Amino acid sequence: MVQRWLYSTNAKDIAVLYFMLAIFSGMAGTAMSLIIRLELAAPGSQYLHGNSQLFNVLVVGHAVLMIFFLVMPALIGGFGNYLLPLMIGATDTAFPRINNIAFWVLPMGLVCLVTSTLVESGAGTGWTVYPPLSSIQAHSGPSVDLAIFALHLTSISSLLGAINFIVTTLNMRTNGMTMHKLPLFVWSIFITAFLLLLSLPVLSAGITMLLLDRNFNTSFFEVSGGGDPILYEHLFWFFGHPEVYILIIPGFGIISHVVSTYSKKPVFGEISMVYAMASIGLLGFLVWSHHMYIVGLDADTRAYFTSATMIIAIPTGIKIFSWLMNPFSKDKNKNKNKKLIRNYQKMNNNNMMKTYLNNNNMIMMNMYKGNLYDIYPRSNRNYIQPNNINKELVVYGYNLESCVGMPTYTNIVKHMVGIPNNILYIMTGILLTDGWIDYTSKKDLDKKTIMEINCRFRLKQSMIHSEYLMYVFMLLSHYCMSYPKMKIAKVKGKSYNQLEFYTRSLPCFTILRYMFYNGRVKIVPNNLYDLLNYESLAHMIMCDGSFVKGGGLYLNLQSFTTKELIFIMNILKIKFNLNCTLHKSRNKYTIYMRVESVKRLFPMIYKYILPSMRYKFDIMLWQKKYNMIN
């Protein structure tokens, strides 16, 4: 048994080994990703106690594990070894022993990578290993050297596998199978093998030069010795961008076969799909510097790489629309698989649009001189100061670590688990009045389905209060996916216009729903004392408060029992020293705040009240009579 798995030259056995390694690496990489996400879930240090080096080491480990030890071994080594010989009618690959060596080099690389994280403080260089952060001055120990050796070993493994797949495809096809008759998955592995063969030597050269700089006193990337660290970036991204297609083209091949299976017909335009994959692979070598816009490329260089990148959308579009041309059968048992394919196609369409917008950045940087809010109108002013920011950095932030420059998305990631306190106070005031949290717009979901989905926050206001609704929307814009919409509501037979917005369905709102709801009934949370402040009271008044003649205030809180209203009233008395009583109006109880309490409350909440909502106060009367506004 041991001999079979250690010395096997059978392509299927080796494919199983690739899958096992990929699963192990995927679990380790996912664990690192969870630690990273938990650390970023809220501002400040959460679990790593401010150890930024450890955070960087986790980023390096996660990236290298996922790219070189999960996706590439699974898609190329696993599916390629298992399916390619079967699809071309070969008994095995052309070089079975090289195939075995190609796999067993990978675990050695994994050992080097794990060792690099344990030596001294680890390799905290970021997954791109840019100098001078990866130079001997920043990382004097052997951790970066071990990480470079790990990359070398994965490169050797991929090169051996690529040579094996190319020779197998060219020389071991069954009789009568010409190149034009090859299945699309075989073509995808064949094209990917050429990409590996052409790009990996460049990466190996770059990291070897870095290794020499670190250990043999050369100056390839050392500025003080006449070197240029930008050279490393060019070498890395000449490999890095084809690597994107190395990862996705085998997926293209798999999706093509799945689409063909469920449509029960060949993929539309099979030959054009092959040429599209080849074009994507070729153009992938001509666009690497779109990852480097921020390093100071001249205008002509940026214009070339922008144009070349946009051209890649043409062969990608051919593939997308060829998949869309295949209608699916009416087999009801395959709905989940159809949804999977449709979602994959939607994802590709979104990526195409993102690529198009991303590559207009050069035009925006050269021609646009306006405010940042006009570029990102939904960016939160609490996170970005428009007059003190480098617009080029924000626009080209897509190309750094896919996090800078996307304020909407990064804010969602930050607050998926917990809502920041300043927003939580506001939402508490709104949820006690007109706001509510629901599961979905569909009413036919069973209980099991409801438990598996996240919740969203909703708010409706009449057109009179549209400015207030837009103000709340701007505060929560990084949770939202669309702008507020106008709807026609009917109350007691009368129609009137109102505005409504709702957020994305996120875990943070699910947690809020568990606090404020019991089933479908809104309740008062037990920890309401900690969730209220003066800003919460201001939003309670703006949402559903009304002043009466004489200076008193009614809080028309929604859907609460008498006991819950008494509980809220006691909190207002204890925490804010407000004298409140219960009044019954139209068979409903409301909280009435006496005029003396309103006098004390008004200066505290005045700064939170919007100008359009001050009609609820007689401002001139309060200024003149009580002299409470500075």
UniProtKB/Swiss-Prot annotation:
Region annotation COX1 exons encoded: where it falls in the sequence: 1-324
Molecular function GO labels: cytochrome-c oxidase activity; endonuclease activity; heme binding
Top-tier EC class: hydrolase
Membrane-crossing residue ranges in chain numbering: 16-36, 57-77, 101-121, 147-167, 182-202, 235-255, 267-287, 305-325, 417-437, 464-483
Cofactors demanded by this protein: Mg(2+)
Membrane topology, as annotated: Multi-pass membrane protein
Pfam annotation, one family: LAGLIDADG_2
InterPro entries given in the database record: Cyt_c_oxase-like_su1_dom, Cyt_c_oxase-like_su1_sf, Cyt_C_Oxase_1, Cyt_c_Oxase_su1_BS, Homing_endonucl, LAGLIDADG_dom
EC number(s) stated in the UniProt entry for this protein: 3.1.-.-
UniProt keyword list: Endonuclease, Hydrolase, Intron homing, Membrane, Mitochondrion, mRNA processing, mRNA splicing, Nuclease, Transmembrane, Transmembrane helix
COX1 intron aI5_alpha encoded as annotated region, ranges: 325-630
Superkingdom as given in the UniProt entry: Eukaryota
Family matches, as PANTHER family: CYTOCHROME C OXIDASE SUBUNIT 1
Protein purpose: Mitochondrial DNA endonuclease involved in intron homing. It introduces a specific double-strand break in the DNA of the COX1 gene and thus mediates the insertion of an intron, containing its own coding sequence (group I intron), into an intronless gene. Recognizes with limited specificity and cleaves the sequence 5'-ATCTTCTCTTGATTAGCCCTGATCTACGG-3' after the nucleotide sequence ATTA leaving a four-base overhang and a 3'-OH.
Family in the record: In the N-terminal section; belongs to the heme-copper respiratory oxidase family. In the C-terminal section; belongs to the LAGLIDADG endonuclease family.
Subunit field text: Heterodimer of a 32 kDa catalytic subunit and a larger 60 kDa polypeptide subunit.
Protein name listed in UniProt: Intron-encoded DNA endonuclease aI5 alpha
Source species: Saccharomyces cerevisiae (strain ATCC 204508 / S288c) (Baker's yeast)
